Amino acid sequence: GVSGCGSGSTRPARSTCFLPLYGHDVQEANDDTIPDDVAEKILRFARGAVAAGWMKNKAYVNIGAVTMGIAGSFCDAGILQKYFGIRAEWVDEVEILRRISIGIYDHDEYEKALAWVRENCKEGFDKNLGKNLPPVITKSKIVPADKDWEFIVKMTLIIRDILYGNPRLDEMGWHEEALGRNAVVGGFQGQRQWTDWLPNADFTEAIMASTFDWNGPKAPTPFATENDTCNGIAMMLGSLVSGSAPCFHDVRTYWSPEACERVTGQKPDGVAANGFIHLINSGATALDGSGACVDAEGNHVMKPFWEMTDADIKACLNATDWCRADYEYFRGGGYSSHFRCKAEMPVTMLRFNIVEGIGPVLQIAEGWTADLPDEIHNTIDKRTDPTWPTTWFCPRLTGQGAFTDVYSVMANWGCQPWCDRLWPCGC
């Protein structure tokens, strides 16, 4: 940057005349070090610049259309183009069935991925056992339960290929399919035209958003449940500036200390002393959200993908089991990425909204995940769907406005009770 800019001091605190990068202390003219506070500002700007450059001219790939009339699933192509420089593309879900039927996927990688899943993705409990399900449900599951993983792994490979392309397909003679859609973010409709008879995309969504798969560490793919475009954009923004996994959650319930004590017999304490918000998506969240990774000091963290180690990957896999989907609302079956975030770590909650007459609005709430006592967790968890991934969130409060208390944070959250994102806290 250019020093001086009209300032009369020898080495002014401002380090550039183009950006507001003010250092805290005036330096000597011959001091060529970059102060820590200025370095952090430069890095923040650089991360934002890289994110903006990376998304430009790429695409949001809608696989399917609007899910159950959800407002966030209405893809506004104009907003995407004008504000983010990305295109909107649509691919019908039937394309997945075409590629499975004809075999348009890397068969060698399929065998590798399936073997990895069988070795590392342990199955959880099956809540369908013992139920007397009506014919409308039993007749709807056309993929046999013992073939679910095979179908799901193929679907995952195919969706990834649709988004990014795959040169292996070109070698197989499928040139157009090998090109992909130049995606930077995407989403899958699923409900209900797909999930009423085929395995859901919970595994696909969870593993794509994670910082690893059967090939080892990888950049996470922002990939929205129910093709919730607004949440997909929030996932994209958070991942591009942090390099970490976007965790898709529904903002389900605010639990006051009083309500918690009445229902569970215990009052929360620690970071949850003022109450907490139950974050739980309908079966799919990046495995990084388990909080199983640890840094050099032993703190539980969500790491950028380039810092993920074999030990981190194993820890996330061990913290997660895969429960069969409830056939009463996922008739086609599937597997949910079930975990309980037992870490207490700083995170950022993020929501992208589109407000009529105003335009795009971004909501941000910093806070912590909470590790609640078993007596509290088990009681509340069973009130929803215990096969889904659960996180307890405690926002950082200011005593004013939307951050007056925990209830205010949830009450002011856009389009709730739908979704939010979690990332490592800060910029």
Question: What positions do the PLM features span?
Answer:
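An N-terminal assembly and electron-transfer interface module characteristic of large anaerobic redox
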Residues: 1-427
